[in-house]
Design a protein with these regions (language model features):
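Repeated loop/turn-to-beta-strand initiation elements of outer-membrane beta-barrel proteins
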Residues: 6-8, 40-45, 71-77, 107-113, ...
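Outer-membrane beta-barrel initiation region
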Residues: 2-37
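Transmembrane beta-strands of outer-membrane beta-barrel pores
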Residues: 12-18, 38-40, 47-51, 68, ...
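Residues that define the transmembrane beta-barrel architecture of outer-membrane proteins
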Residues: 4, 26-30, 56-60, 73, ...
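Glycine- and aromatic-enriched membrane insertion/assembly motifs of diderm outer-membrane
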Residues: 24-81
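Outer-membrane beta-barrel architecture
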Residues: 33-35, 63-65, 99-103, 132-136, ...
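Outer-membrane beta-barrel "beta-signal"
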Residues: 165-176, 191-205
Length: 205
């Protein structure tokens, strides 16, 4: 029997985060995602509740991509459309990102390099880059510790460095929990750039 090409995930978190920043004004967020996979190709639709100063009350990501392996490296190339419903009139709240992930395991350490680019970002932000390096180690069959550090550069936007460290544990085949600390080097930019501890629960179907 052929595997179902569709998968679903529901989630709840103590706060919605994105690119190292708080995006739900320190309030809980719920999310959902549906993914279609066929061979290396995939498409997904993700939505989460948010609360941004520009009035946005949600974020919706529509992604198409392709995964493959080249010389021992896992490659994931994707195009992402971001839309932020509820944003005040006159603010650019829909934009497209281009993303490339390269991953490889070195002994017990799993690594991933991510490069994300847009030529016209949210609100007044224009060209922007997000470059992130992540590493993780399996503590046991159900638990993995990971850490990541990233640089954000943006024309007409804020430049900052972000990092996170945390532990994810599978409770069973469907439920998983994640406890993670997020922080940046620019607390002077506002509360969303300050350090925060985020707990999340996901259900995979």
């Amino acid at each position: 029997m052929a595997a179902d090409p569709f998968s679903f995930q529901l989630g709840v978190a103590s706060e919605y985060t994105g690119k190292g920043l708080g995006k739900s004004d320190e309030q809980p967020s719920v999310s959902g995602q549906v993914t279609w996979t066929q061979g290396g190709a995939y498409a997904s639709l993700f939505g989460a509740t948010a609360d941004l100063p520009q009035g946005s009350d949600a974020e919706i990501l529509t992604t198409i991509g392709y995964r493959t392996t080249v010389s021992g490296y896992g490659l994931d190339l994707s195009v992402i459309n971001r839309d932020l419903p509820g944003t005040r009139s006159g603010i650019d709240a829909n934009y497209t990102e281009f993303q490339a992930d390269a991953s490889r395991t070195f002994g017990p350490v799993a690594t991933r390099l991510r490069v994300n680019y847009t030529d016209d970002g949210f609100a007044g932000t224009k060209e922007a880059w997000w470059v992130e390096l992540q590493g993780g180690v399996a503590i046991n069959a159900a638990t993995k510790a990971t850490a990541a550090i990233a640089d954000r550069t943006a024309r007409n936007g804020n430049d900052y460095r972000a990092w996170n460290v945390g532990v994810k544990r599978k409770l069973d085949d469907r439920f998983a929990v994640d406890l993670r600390w997020y922080d940046t080097d620019r607390h002077d930019f506002g509360e969303s750039y300050e350090g925060r501890l985020v707990a999340a629960l996901t259900l995979s179907l």
